[in-house]
Amino acid sequence: MSMSSAHPPSMAGAFPANATTHADGILLTAISSERTHLRANSGPHTSAAGAVPVDVYVDFHSGPCQRFEAAVGSTLDEMFGAGDITLAYHPVAVLDALSTTRYSSRAAASSGCASDGGRFREYVRALFAHQPPEYSAGLTNDELVEIGAKVGLTDSAFAECVRTEHYEEWTTWVTVRAGDRGVNWWPTVHVAAEPVRANAEAIRAAVSGAASAEADQAW
């Protein structure tokens, strides 16, 4: 499917819940407390105003992205839970050639369905935990529905959204927008709109630097 980078999908229901300003990603609003380093009784947590923006570009069929999630995901969740950052994920689909069923596109589209169901971050973790081998058929849509059920996405609307690939066009838009921004490697991490190395130490340092710069400007 081709799409002009100047024109996002215009059909009704084209964007998932909590889409970013340009509808090219998902902005987290909360993460279940049992999956972060927050106190067990703290409940869902949202980022504070003035937090440093962090953008993460991933393909759900990318081995490096899976390793990034395993190594850095908890750090991102911790900083988000503390209110230090806002966190946006941009699920691109550039590795469809690594499966026989367009798995990258289908997985990315299904993450939009998870955002509608209020369990986006939990579903992202589960997708990476169940990542199929490269050059395989990938997971079926029914298997994606089953993964969603494991993180609390049991509503029939989620299942229908995944099985009909409702957010296929949105996935294309996210991928086009990433290319327009010069993103050509996955994972890619931007802190305050600047690219940084995709490891916990570099991200923490960049967030600290951006927060200090903002504080200096406030004076």
Question: Residue ranges of each PLM-predicted region?
Answer:
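Sec-exported extracytoplasmic/periplasmic mature domains
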Residues: 67-70, 77, 81, 112-119, ...
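C-terminal cap of thioredoxin/glutaredoxin-like
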Residues: 3-17, 149-219
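Extracytoplasmic/secreted proteins, especially bacterial periplasmic and envelope-associated proteins
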Residues: 67, 71-75, 105-109, 119-122, ...
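A mature extracytoplasmic/lumenal domain signature
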Residues: 58, 91-93, 127, 162, ...
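Extracytoplasmic thiol/disulfide redox context detector
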Residues: 1-99, 209-219
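Loop/turn elements at helix/coil->beta-strand transitions in domains of secreted/extracellular proteins
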Residues: 51-52, 83-86, 117-122, 153-155, ...
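Structural microenvironment flanking redox-active thiols in thiol-disulfide oxidoreductases
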Residues: 78-116, 120-146
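Extracytoplasmic/secreted cell-surface and envelope-processing proteins
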Residues: 65, 97-98, 137, 197-199
